[in-house]
Amino acid sequence: MYDVTSIQNLKKDVLYLVAKASFEGTLEEERDHIPEKMIEGPEPTFRCCIYKEREIVRQRIRLAEGKAPGAEDDGNIVQVIKSACADCPISSYVVTNNCQNCLGKDCIKACRFGAIEPGHTRSRIDSQKCKECGMCAKACPYNAIAHVSRPCKDSCPVDAISYDEYGVSVIDEEKCIRCGQCAAKCPFGAIGTKTWITNVIADLKAGKKVYAILAPATEGQFGKDITMESWRQAVKKVGFEDLIEAGLGGDMTTCSEAEEWLEAYRNGEKKTTSCCPGFVNMIRKHYPDLADMISTTVSPMCAVSRMIKAKDPDAVTVFVGPCVAKKSEVADQKIEGNADYALNYNEILAIMKAKDVELEPAENTYQDSTIFGKFYGNSGGVTDSVLEYMKETEQNEDIKVCKANGAAECKKALMFLQRGRLPEDFIEGMACEGGCVGGPSRNEEIIKARKVRETMIKSADDRKITDNLKRYDMDSFSMHR
């Protein structure tokens, strides 16, 4: 019996059943039976009928296999599950029961489009005439007019979501920056992302050397007892060759980024960071004239992947973290030597569960990166790391950095840069508020995770960035795109 009353449980169960069937080699036979296993009937649980519920599961299975949920595929990692959509109201402004049907009719007077008319018990808004300007809501002395909007549309920082004639959400692939916030915010789970769990499992079964690259934001996501060593032990039990901290790539990126920043600063040029793919997508799609200002340094994920492949050209590298945009970096940017796949926490946990492996408490004995590399998962972490490296190498330029925390701040900073009014020398952009720890696929709320995370990181040794990088052959691979 599967608990389909929670969207989180529904997502996890679909991923688990697909992963289990993939390991057992029965996915082709099981694919059409999974919806019936999960939705037994005869009574529906969360939709109008069991057939719609099963169709939702069916489309989620397609996403789990890396396909679009329907027949059409626009190539976007983020997809609308149409069978799960259309339950949200389209009308942006509605008159609530708080309306006193007063004689003043300030709402009607405030509307310039004739969209409001008096009703028998309260005013009425004609959605065909309403321009969603909000003047009626501001004018009402009883605050009786509410602004009701879809969570997916509200969460999108680049206005990439609209609706079709049936009220189903539509993602504009040309605008979408793949941040994944819409998928996280939809309370019906009507937006999801493609996964590579079947590909990863196929490579594990084929005996390939598969390496996990674990995001620095992971520490704190699963409580203080689940350490990097916990993850390392778990993925090795599943069949991975090893696990490497992406924070090590943060140290590597820091060195290269510092060199770029110093060169640009001395030449009077401005730059942006390149490690957040959501931020990079925002620049390329919405501020294309600034694309040349993006740092050419590869992301920490790519740096670690290149390091691994420099030693073992046949290695398969898999990023694991709370980020949806990392999937876009893998699928869309096609950077040589980058990670082959990217998984979120639910996806890697589904793979573990399919092999009866659980994350278990372990002493935090495993450390690849410096504390600064670990803080790459926080907004401002890149800046702090680069400035620390400059200090260690005695390059004390008075560099000013705009730390853009979240998509809204990124847009503001880029607008200033575009107009030549940015006072700082560089922009560190993080599309998710709080940084990677606020990613849409996070396992824990930001405030709670941050407290645990800071405690865990304090227990790490305080090695210097320059000393840490001496352990690795940095000349065996390139740090640039």
Positions of PLM-derived features:
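Iron-sulfur-associated redox domains of electron-transfer enzymes in respiratory
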Residues: 1-60, 64-66, 193-481
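N-terminal [4Fe-4S]-dependent radical SAM core
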Residues: 71-96, 113-114
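Gly-rich Lys/Arg/Thr-decorated short loops/hinges at beta-loop-alpha junctions or inter-strand turns
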Residues: 86-94, 117-122, 163, 181, ...
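Small-residue-rich
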Residues: 67-75, 107-108, 200
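Residue-level recognition of alpha-helix initiation/capping sites
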Residues: 102, 131, 147, 177, ...
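Iron-sulfur cluster-binding cysteine motifs and their immediate structural context
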Residues: 104-127, 131, 135-177, 181-197, ...
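Glycine-rich adenosyl-nucleotide cofactor-binding module
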Residues: 88-109, 138
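A secondary-structure boundary/capping signal
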Residues: 95, 126, 172, 214-215, ...
